[in-house]
Amino acid sequence: MAALIDTGIFFGFYSLKDVHHMDSVAIVVHAVEGKWGRLFVTNHILDETLTLLKYKKLPADKFLEGFVESGVLNIIYTDDEVERKALEVFKARVYEKGFSYTDAISEVVAEELKLKLISYDSRFSLPTIGRDYWKSLDESERKRISAILREKGIDG
């Protein structure tokens, strides 16, 4: 089992004001604990995440240290075949509001490698894990995750 994690999860994790902050915190805790097996991002998601965090003045350096350099995330560098398939997916959906080339890459990679897709993006044609994740947890699990945040000195 393995999962591809989309940019919005990391943005929500670092952005305390984001509507999905607690969803992201719970997803990251469960992901790091191994709930979905090996964790992946594509080089496109990595680019998008680093750029967004830096642009929004959020800790891109902490993301690099905590997720990339630590080995928590495995990076999938897309090859020509994946890029060509993603271009076709993107072309077919070019007028769909909010659907990006990075989304097309993610969809192709998740489908080909049979990865769970962890994202808040409802435009994917594949099922996703993400929206209302925090609400789906029972009270004891929410308390456990909140205790982890307090222990680490993180607002939640």
UniProtKB/Swiss-Prot annotation:
A Pfam family of the record is: PIN
Keyword Membrane, does the record have it?
A: no
For this protein, the record's Gene3D superfamilies field holds: 5'-nuclease (3.40.50.1010)
UniProt keyword annotations, A-Z: Hydrolase, Magnesium, Metal-binding, Nuclease, Toxin-antitoxin system
| Record domain PINc: where | 4-125
Q: Where, by residue number, does Mg(2+) bind?
A: D6, D103
* TM helices/strands, residue ranges: none
- The top EC class, named as a word, is hydrolase
One example of a Gene Ontology biological process annotation: rRNA catabolic process
Say yes or no: keyword Magnesium present.
yes
Q: List the EC numbers from the record.
A: 3.1.-.-
The cofactor named in the record is:
Mg(2+)
Which GO terms of the molecular function aspect are on file? Answer: magnesium ion binding; RNA endonuclease activity
SUPFAM superfamilies in UniProt: PIN domain-like (SSF88723)
Q: Which family does it belong to?
A: Belongs to the PINc/VapC protein family.
Function recorded in the entry:
Toxic component of a type II toxin-antitoxin (TA) system. An RNase.
Q: What is this protein called?
A: VapC ribonuclease AF_1683
Organism equals Archaeoglobus fulgidus (strain ATCC 49558 / DSM 4304 / JCM 9628 / NBRC 100126 / VC-16)
From which lineage does this chain's organism come? Archaea, Methanobacteriati, Methanobacteriota, Archaeoglobi, Archaeoglobales
